[in-house]
Swiss-Prot record:
Taxonomic lineage: Bacteria, Pseudomonadati, Thermodesulfobacteriota, Desulfuromonadia, Geobacterales
Organism (species): Geobacter sulfurreducens (strain ATCC 51573 / DSM 12127 / PCA)
Subunit composition and interactions: Part of the 50S ribosomal subunit; part of the 5S rRNA/L5/L18/L25 subcomplex. Contacts the 5S rRNA. Binds to the 5S rRNA independently of L5 and L18.
UniProt-listed Gene3D superfamilies: Ribosomal protein L25, beta domain, Ribosomal Protein L25, Chain P
Keyword Ribonucleoprotein: yes
HAMAP family in the cross-refs: Ribosomal_bL25_CTC
Any one biological process term the GO annotation gives: translation
SUPFAM superfamilies: Ribosomal protein L25-like
Function: This is one of the proteins that binds to the 5S RNA in the ribosome where it forms part of the central protuberance.
UniProt protein name: Large ribosomal subunit protein bL25
Record family assignment: Belongs to the bacterial ribosomal protein bL25 family. CTC subfamily.
Molecular function in Gene Ontology: 5S rRNA binding; structural constituent of ribosome
Keyword tags: Ribonucleoprotein, Ribosomal protein, RNA-binding, rRNA-binding
GO CC, one annotated term: cytosolic large ribosomal subunit
């Protein structure tokens, strides 16, 4: 996975009022935490954060921090992000400092690939699970996990245990969790002419 670089600054003051003032200047308040360090309050330009999590990797992008005193050069991933429910603006971000040698737990989106045979027969595709919790090394985090639905017939489902996963990926979800199914009635054959 591609590593991205993002500039941050340390934040001296905390609180609602300070956070509001930062957001008014298009700056997102955040925190960096992880194994072996105390949580550190930071701030990042909203446009820089949006650009960093856009495109390949998304929220699971490996981010090398630039600036921020002792945080300079640390590698982080986005652990949590709060958005304004109406505008979609990022209100706050939590970064988790990671080591490239230790496994991490992340959410990876599922992408349905192909047109299901059951849909061609008049059924309806019902996606039940949109992402999986996985554990892997940071450099092995997949952008998404593809689910091939091409051979899925009416009345059938695909479960977590049936997925073909990239090497080094361990799924933390229950293996019996359904991902996608096809609902509907199969087309009836035309009655034979007498």
């Amino acid at each position: 996975m591609e590593q991205k670089t993002m500039s941050i600054e340390l934040r001296e003051k905390n609180g609602k009022g300070v956070a509001r003032k930062l957001r008014a200047q298009d700056v997102v308040p955040g925190v960096v935490y992880g194994k072996g360090i105390e949580p550190v309050s930071v701030k990042v330009a909203a446009k820089d954060l949006a650009a960093t999590i856009a495109g390949e990797g998304g929220l699971n992008s490996l981010i090398t921090l630039s600036g921020g005193g002792s945080l300079n050069g640390n590698i982080v991933i986005v652990a949590d992000m709060q958005r304004n429910p109406l505008k979609g603006d990022i209100l706050h971000v939590d970064f988790h400092r990671i080591s490239l040698d230790e496994k991490v737990k992340v959410h990876v989106p599922l992408v349905m690939v192909g047109t299901a045979a059951g849909v061609k027969e008049g059924g309806m595709l019902d996606v039940v699970t949109y992402s999986l919790d996985v554990e892997c090394l940071p450099t092995a985090i997949p952008e998404a996990i593809n689910v091939d639905v091409t051979n899925l017939a009416i009345g059938h489902s695909i479960h977590v245990s049936e997925l073909v996963l990239p090497a080094g990926i361990k799924v933390l979800n229950d293996p019996e969790t359904p991902i996608v199914s096809i609902h509907g009635k199969a087309k009836e054959e035309a009655p034979a002419a007498e």
